[in-house]
Amino acid sequence: MATSRDRLGTLEAEGSSGRQGYSGVEVVLSSDPATPAPLCPHELGPTLLFVKVNQGKEETRRFYACSACRDRKDCNFFQWEDEKLSGARLAAREAHNRSCQPPLSRSQCVERYLKFIELPLSQRKFCQSCQQLLLPDDEEKHHEHQVVGDVSITQLKRPSKLLYPLENKKTNAQYLFADRSCLFLVDLLSNLGFRRVLCVGTPRLHELIRLKESGGTKSNIRSLLLDIDFRYSQFYMEDSFCHYNMFNHHFFDGKAALEVCKTFLQEDKGEGVIMVTDPPFGGLVEPLAVTFKKLIAMWKEGHSQDNSQKELPIFWIFPYFFESRICQFFPSFCMLDYQVVDYDNHALYKHGKTGRKQSPVRIFTNIPPNKIILPIEEGYRFCPLCQRYVSLENQHCEHCNSCTSKDGRKWNHCFLCKKCVKPSWIHCSICNHCALPDHSCKGPKDGCFICGELDHKRSACPNISTSKKVNKAVRKQKQRKSNKMKMETTKGQSMNHTSATRKKKRRERTHQYLCS
């Protein structure tokens, strides 16, 4: 699920920095389990706990917000962690949440699907306006809508071709793999010997695996799709699709869907399964990592203690500039040089002159890179020194002892920085590191918000308790000033009122005297 060019600069800054961008908002991963998170209005499951940080100048205060939406226009849910809600407000929120749920339950969708495939071709219709398969009884309600007729079984097996992509870049970012990218992944998974694929946010890959399985081609791979788009519920049985939010590990259909996923992962004692995920690039790495670790723990439950050191194989498709953040949570991961460029409905990430070299999309995996063969015909070669496939432009650096390029271009070695850098970067003597020629030397720096050191974050700062005390004192002082100003304003207004009353009475006495 890719994102647009106008977001890449922001995302690269966030990915390469030591914190969540420069907005001063961080995810709180360890919330109190005894206090369940509230649900956001559009029913994407439990919210996440965040904290605002302003370089240690103000006391931090936690708040709940939507797990999937980074834009308040998409989901305006906001609640302070310590905020006490009235019973009336809680009841109103619950009623609103119920009104925002999908119109059909999971069992109703399955029941309708079974009826739909039994219909003759002439009666199989799909409403593009409502994004819904229509049964004969539904046609009257949709007679003014844009309806597609003669929906074939082949079309039903490719629902992503029927459904309009959800292209909200910060929430769904549903940019779909082209068949070319999917075929490469399917062939790679097959060559690696996997028999089951857990597709987390990869509906096109799920479709192609199922097509190969049912099409008589040599494929013994099965797949299960976990996706936040509830529209897929009307095309799959319960054992093929689970409505799921990867940002908070929430199964919308409860324990039944959870058991489907668990059974799929633990089949054959967990052997022969891999997870492939393509999250929205605007999503936060931290909650995704927490979710994936929960899926890994679910997979490990089916293992014996002898295999406790094994890892669930994973392909995480994400921009290369998030490498350090991903490896922070998964140290065993490495980034492949393969550039995922083919997204059907994306203007930039397509194969051709404007495609591959501009794509930041890579595959992060815990599978040894020497086992993964990349296509030579697409411009990849095997580096015998690194023991992995790399792009042709990615030259081996004898000083770094590695093929160092991340973006497909030839990088240059900087002897002052003691590492390879992008060809467009130069060494800045003021900043003492390489950067773009027109960079600002006074720009924001990585490291701790409180003390400025680079070796730790704000949450691990030894001065955090002192900072909190100072912030608390500053906050109290501000509160006292505010209260004093209010009192002075009130007092001034009272004195002005008394003075005006006295003047009025004086005028009245003078008037009476003159008239007498």
From Swiss-Prot:
Q: Name one GO biological process term.
A: rRNA methylation
For bias type Basic residues, the affected ranges are 472-484, 500-509
Where does this protein hold S-adenosyl-L-methionine? Q174, Y175, L176, F177, R204, D227, N245, M246, D278
> What highest taxon heads this organism's lineage?
Eukaryota
- What does the UniProt keyword field contain? Cytoplasm, Metal-binding, Methyltransferase, Nucleus, S-adenosyl-L-methionine, Transferase, Zinc, Zinc-finger
State the protein's purpose.
rRNA N6-methyltransferase that specifically methylates the adenine in position 4220 of 28S rRNA. N6-methylation of adenine(4220) in 28S rRNA is required for translation.
The free-text domain note is:
The regulatory loop blocks the catalytic center by bridging the methyltransferase domain and the C-terminal CCHC-type zinc finger, resulting in an autoinhibitory conformation.
Q: What is this protein called?
A: rRNA N(6)-adenosine-methyltransferase ZCCHC4
Which species is this record about?
A: Bos taurus (Bovine)
